[in-house]
Amino acid sequence: MNQSETLFAQAKTVIPGGVNSPVRAFNGVGGSPIFFTRGEGAYLFDEDDKKYIDYVASWGSMILGHTNQAVIIAVKTTLENGLGFGAPTQIETKLAEKVCELMPSIELVRMVSSGTEATMSAIRLARGHTGRDKIIKFEGCYHGHSDSLLIKAGSGALTLGVPTSPGVPKDFAKHTLTLEYNNIDQVCEVLSEVGAEVACIIVEPVAGNMNCIPPIDGFLQVLRELCDEYGVILVFDEVMTGFRVALGGAQAFYNVKPDLTTLGKVIGGGLPVGAFGGKREIMQSIAPLGPVYQAGTLSGNPISMSAGLVMLNVLSKDENFYTILNTKVQKLTKGILAKAKENNIGMTANVVGGMFGLFFTDSQSVTNFKETSQCNIELFKKFFHLMLAEGVYMAPSAYEAGFVSSAHSDTDIQNTIDAAGRAFIKLT
């Protein structure tokens, strides 16, 4: 038994399932999770000091790699003055100004402590501002674990949905319509029936929790047009894509302006943080300016704010940052696909900016949750463990996107491609 297995057994005695977030338990791939002790650049090191090339990047947060010194120095400097005050600080305003500068759709922004808190608050704000109760979300898009968003689709577009977790009252389902991602006709159909009752449409502009699924041509643009037509607030959940696929997020990448945006991950430099923001007229409905209540003891924590500000400053200084990052992702995925083809293994890939998805399928494209579920999940599980043995750490689920950081070198990318080649040989 290695150190990770020993620690996992110990963790299970005091933590439900031994983890503080379910995907970490390796239930999606089998086996025991790896316990890490440190990160450095593109690498993670486990309790036995084995080194891994990391493509999870703390679920997308570590776009500069682990222990980036600019971020570390900012955090150390800030914490020497105190861990938090529960009161306003200048650094909150500076980060808010930077977010508004980089994302023009955001005129006012409120800091919170997680992505779930951001989406939950944005939904409440949309309902409070419009006076409507219904929301539309899309199958396979994850927006955190608040009750309103843990609803799966019914048998038809307007059929009552079903909670995806015990503990979520069935009454919540009547207010949440879950549609197929990238299905424009279905959105048109539903809005034509109940558009006057819908407060908002919330969508991951690039879905990252059914692996990596980009929007088909026109999907986001039509959502924008339909929301304008029916007076519905368009919410982009950019917790994953914000500052990851482009400096201005997916909304800049696809040139579509939402009314509200939720943020997390990169905006905190790797520390716990979230944010939601958007049009001034909508954001002014939030307390203390308006009647929609939202609050948080740790919101705007100065350590998280300082890490996020340095992160965004670094990203915005290099105009070639995202071009270089995408070049790395393209090299990685094209190399892996070539190795798969050499071994007669069906595989396709999706790439947007600094994120990617690999799918074991003979299909040329994967565009929604149903198509992701039809991929060869069992083959992915075997591939995951073969890559782990090669010292490559990928997301422990066929439904999670992968991420490259600026710290990944050409050698890291090539070593990963070579490792995939050896793994494919063992799969055949």
Swiss-Prot record:
One of its GO terms (biological process) is protoporphyrinogen IX biosynthetic process. The modification N6-(pyridoxal phosphate)lysine is found at K265. The keyword Cytoplasm applies. The keyword Zinc-finger does not apply. Its cofactor is pyridoxal 5'-phosphate. Its EC number is 5.4.3.8. GO terms for cellular component: cytoplasm. PROSITE patterns: AA_TRANSFER_CLASS_3. It comes from the Bacteria. It catalyses: (S)-4-amino-5-oxopentanoate = 5-aminolevulinate. Keywords: Cytoplasm, Isomerase, Porphyrin biosynthesis, Pyridoxal phosphate. HAMAP family: HemL_aminotrans_3 (MF_00375). Belongs to the class-III pyridoxal-phosphate-dependent aminotransferase family. HemL subfamily. This is Glutamate-1-semialdehyde 2,1-aminomutase. It comes from Ruthia magnifica subsp. Calyptogena magnifica. The gene is hemL.
